[in-house]
Amino acid sequence: MSAKLKEHVNYIPGISSIPLVNIPFRGRNQQMTQRFLEAFSWVTKAQYLLFTAIYEFESKVFDVLKAKFSFPVYDMGPIVLNFDFGENTNHRDNNYLHWLDCQPRSSILYISMGSFLLVSSAQMDEIAAGLRNSGVRFFWVARDETSKLKEVCGHRGLVVPWCNQLRVLSHSSVGGFWSHCGWSSTREGMLCGIPFFTFPIIFDQILNSKLIVEDWKIGWRVKQDVGMDNLVTRVEIARLVQKFMDLENDEVKEFRTRASEVQRVCQRAIAKGGSSETSINAFIEDLSHCMVIEYKAAVLAKGRLEIDKSTFAKLEHKTKEIREDQPLPDSKKKKN
């Protein structure tokens, strides 16, 4: 890695110091980078800015954004659907859930590198061999490599083409999450209180890995050098996996404790009166208020003022139905 890429960027508002090499989009697909930059340029035209993140974990960023924009910025995270599973188990879940039921508590390393596999064949071979040599129990989701990996990995793990990730992460036998650090997977791991073994590949995954390892301190990196061409060897993988899943290791105990603390913050955020629920309610109130104002403006513009009183009353009644269960907070409190 060149000395230039090791330089730290410390002038982005709300973001802690970060090496230049970890900045998303640097030196990668230029066409894709241009599309992302174009999407970012639309933000200034927005009426609202919604994030599936939690204020408590990124308060500096949210404070900067709320100060910069004249429109409301809402933190609505983690927004994970169907977290309360109950007894709703699909029949195709039964085999791997039964396998998990038979494993010791916190003994399984769950591995998922996203829906769009960008890991090279050589790296996949090293990962499989490293897992086999580590002797650690694992559960690996690999859509297109299932048959091959079953042969290579040995009998200590289970390889499947698909699973209900939230159901697996919330299982008592799962003690670690080898993740590509996509934002959806990151949110789910946080909500389940699982420590991360990060393996970012591209774009925002790199920054998410930084948050996990350096800011929140709830995991380790598998890859120290970012980039698809940087191969992590089977020897290094076996060593890291063994240490990561060692429940008696003091360093491991520390980040497992912090992962549990992160889980509690997530649970408070989505609970009644939490930051996430408060933001969602404020957004709904703002939105319903704007609907009434815009409708009145449209009626006035068309010169139909005489027929609008009963119509306005009906519209206002409809918007109140959205928030009929409880009084909502004053939206002005969340705008800046």
Model-flagged regions — what are they?
Residues 1-167, 176, 192, 201-216, ...:
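Nucleotide-sugar-dependent glycosyltransferase catalytic domains
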Residues 185, 196-198, 202-203:
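Short glycine/proline-centered loop/turn elements that form peptide/ligand docking sites
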Residues 157-158, 172-185, 194:
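Acidic donor-binding loop of glycosyltransferase active sites
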Residues 300-336:
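Polybasic, low-complexity terminal segments and linkers that are predominantly intrinsically disordered
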